Amino acid sequence: MIFKGVREGKPYPEHHLSYRDWSRIPPRQIRLDELVTTTKVLALDRLLSEDSTFYGDLFPHAVKWKNVLYLEDGLHRAVRAALRNRTVLHARLLDLDDLDAVTRRA
């Protein structure tokens, strides 16, 4: 299996990050087999489109919550990487576990 899991919907709380907020998070390598998708449907035209990265962020968005990595945005990029026999993906990772720990200490 390419991903750790496939589900529909986000199990984590809403984070309210804008695209500008996401752009401040540096991308890092994430293994595809550590990701759980938050959508079951992939638009084939987005997967096959050469200019699919023209709009939006170049890097997928992932959210860590309760020690699980969820792929929030960029499923087509992750599948494209898998089709090219890549096991890792560069993505921006929002760690809600870290934010929760900081909030509890404050």
Residue ranges: model-predicted function:
Residues F3-K4, E14, P27-I30, L42, ...:
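Hydrophobic transmembrane signal anchors and adjacent membrane-proximal interface regions, especially
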Residues Y55-A106:
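A short, basic-hydrophobic beta/loop patch
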Residues E14-Y70, A82:
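Short alpha-helix boundary/capping and kink motifs at helix termini
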Residues M1-Y19:
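N-terminal leader/domain-start detector
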